[in-house]
């Protein structure tokens, strides 16, 4: 895996029989406050464009809120169905076993690995979130966004918090880090970001996109996970969603993980694993399963009712993780999907195993 780039595209999928569309009444357009409050280095952000609320932190902590709670929330504004999730990569350099990634302990830090193998942090290395219609959001849409990102109620949102949401969208759009690997619409296919020629940030015609980069380049942090030394592995995360709360796409968060081995040795016999601690409302009665034909791992409530969801008048939701396009390997005559493009001569690997443990 030396200097090779692997793409994994997956999806977090939720469903609820009684899920309702979020209501965002129209009000003033192009509302602006003052002063500007964009943050140069936000630590957290979330996908909250459809019916799913899904938190991310710049160091690859995933589905966990800034206040330490469950960070997969479905439907938005109601109960949670994911407490924490992450990705693990394991393999050998020579006869030395390495494992990098995130579980309850995080073995990654925010930042990328430069050509000299050094960790680069600060400056433009942070978490970004864009929304393509941010300039035309209504007063109520901004207020709802501010409530969710500040973990407060709509009635408690301040003008300053609303302004910060707008300013952050603008700052992230204007400073979208294509030079670090963030996706954009390359109209002339030359690999160069040229906004003056109409090229814009984004992927897959999504309405909202998050991008950030993390790595296993910090020795102490990597060792805290499983006692291993770093691989020199860079993780570039792109997440996106669609403003379709009443349609199927509105129940999905897409996640693309770009893995780049910037170490000096090949990583062999490598495995990539997604893991999750799903808490479907009350965590004490959840079940899990897998559909091997779909590479779909899922969790659901053990009964027709759940106290957390009942508080909102809802039946309990279910949640699943699907490999839409797993890691690729050479395979003559086949065609893989990588970076949302067809790649002849390769195939995508499906999920090869599934495991679970019970705790609590």
Question: Residue ranges of each PLM-predicted region?
Answer:
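Bacterial Sec-dependent N-terminal signal peptides
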Residues: 1-23
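A long-range scaffold signal marking pre-active-site subdomains of enzyme folds
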Residues: 20-360
């Amino acid at each position: 895996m030396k200097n090779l780039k692997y793409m994994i595209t997956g999806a977090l999928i939720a469903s609820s029989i009684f899920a309702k569309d979020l209501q965002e009444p129209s009000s003033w357009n192009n509302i602006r406050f003052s002063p500007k409050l964009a943050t140069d280095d936000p630590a957290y952000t979330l996908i909250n464009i459809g019916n799913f609320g899904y938190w991310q932190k710049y160091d690859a902590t995933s589905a966990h809120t800034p206040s330490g709670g469950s960070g997969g929330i479905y439907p938005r504004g109601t109960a949670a169905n994911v407490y924490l999730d992450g990705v693990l990569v394991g393999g050998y350099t020579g006869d030395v076993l390495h494992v990098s990634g995130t579980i309850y302990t995080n073995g990654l830090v925010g930042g990328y690995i430069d050509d000299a193998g050094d960790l680069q942090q600060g400056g433009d290395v942070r978490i970004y979130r864009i929304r393509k219609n941010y300039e035309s959001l209504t007063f109520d849409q901004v207020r709802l966004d501010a409530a969710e990102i500040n973990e407060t109620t709509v009635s408690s949102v301040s003008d300053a918090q609303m302004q910060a949401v707008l300013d952050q969208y603008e700052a992230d759009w204007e400073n979208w880090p294509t030079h670090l690997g963030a996706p954009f619409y390359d109209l002339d296919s030359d690999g160069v970001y040229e906004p003056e020629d109409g090229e814009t940030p984004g992927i897959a015609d999504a309405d909202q996109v998050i991008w950030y980069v993390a790595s296993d380049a910090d020795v102490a942090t990597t060792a805290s996970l499983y006692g291993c030394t770093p691989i020199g592995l860079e993780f570039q995360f792109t997440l996106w969603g669609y403003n379709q709360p009443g349609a199927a796409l509105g129940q999905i968060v897409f996640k693309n993980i770009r893995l780049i081995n910037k170490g000096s040795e090949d990583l062999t016999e490598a495995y990539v694993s997604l893991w999750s601690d799903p808490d479907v409302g009350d965590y004490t009665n959840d079940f899990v399963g897998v559909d091997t034909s779909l590479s779909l791992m899922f969790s659901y409530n053990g009964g027709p009712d759940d106290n957390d969801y009942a508080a909102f008048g809802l039946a309990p939701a279910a949640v699943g993780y699907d490999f839409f396009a797993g890691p690729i390997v050479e395979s003559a005559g086949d065609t893989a999907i990588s970076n949302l493009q067809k790649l002849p001569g390769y195939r995508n690997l499906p999920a090869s195993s599934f495991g679970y443990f019970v705790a609590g």
